[in-house]
Amino acid sequence: MRDELFTEELKKQFEFDERVAGVFDDMLSRSIPYYALALELSADFALANLPKEGGWVYDLGCSTGSLLLEIERRAGAKNPRLIGIDNSEAMLSRARAKALGYGSRVDFIQGDILDFEYQKSEVILCHYTLQFIRPIHRAYLVQKLYDSLKPEGILIFSEKVVSEDRVLDHQMIERYYAYKREQGYSEVEIVKKREALENVLIPYTAKENEKMLLEAGFAHVETLFRWVNFATFIAKKGEA
């Protein structure tokens, strides 16, 4: 279904409810530059860091489940345990419907990623999710994810990022709005979504994200991909 959510007046704070879930796949593809490529890279590196057989993969803020279903499709004999976690039942109902259609064994669980008890895993994925976690809790979550990874495990996540330079940041935002116009969003929709996400989506700079990861204990942090103010990072835990 096409995303026309912000052509109407929203009567409450933005949340991932039934209305958003119904258009979410279209919203992602038209609102996040190279979103499909970020997922493809995530699947590539997730599979490369799994053992020959088995292993655990979590996707936090899994929304409609597309990434885990793609990893499962490509995993073959590796046959990892794939678990998606989201706090939105509306999103998960769509993920489960997709899984049923594909005959998938991916587990989709409703829960709070801050409180969830994770099994030791090789891979944790977290795309455009940390930016919705309040800064006061964000470092705690990253530390918890680090502690949940096995030695040499990886965390792959994507975030909207801000520039340390005010002028450059403004230019980057304007280029992003131009992208949204190219995708068919109107000026009214762009303004309404910006207002809806204010104080809900709180991005860090790339350096702030890297600092948070290193302070949690990750041995290596790399930028896998970046387009203007959207970035995909990979962080690797050291050996035991």
Curated annotation (Swiss-Prot):
The domain of life for this entry's organism is Bacteria
Q: Does the keyword S-adenosyl-L-methionine apply?
A: yes
Q: Which reaction does it catalyse?
A: prephenate + S-adenosyl-L-methionine = carboxy-S-adenosyl-L-methionine + 3-phenylpyruvate + H2O
Q: Which enzyme class?
A: transferase
Entry's Gene Ontology BP terms: tRNA wobble uridine modification
Record field: transmembrane: none
InterPro entries on file: CmoA, Methyltransf_25, SAM-dependent_MTases_sf
* Self-association and partners: Homodimer.
- Put simply, this protein is called Carboxy-S-adenosyl-L-methionine synthase
Q: Which source organism?
A: Wolinella succinogenes (strain ATCC 29543 / DSM 1740 / CCUG 13145 / JCM 31913 / LMG 7466 / NCTC 11488 / FDC 602W)
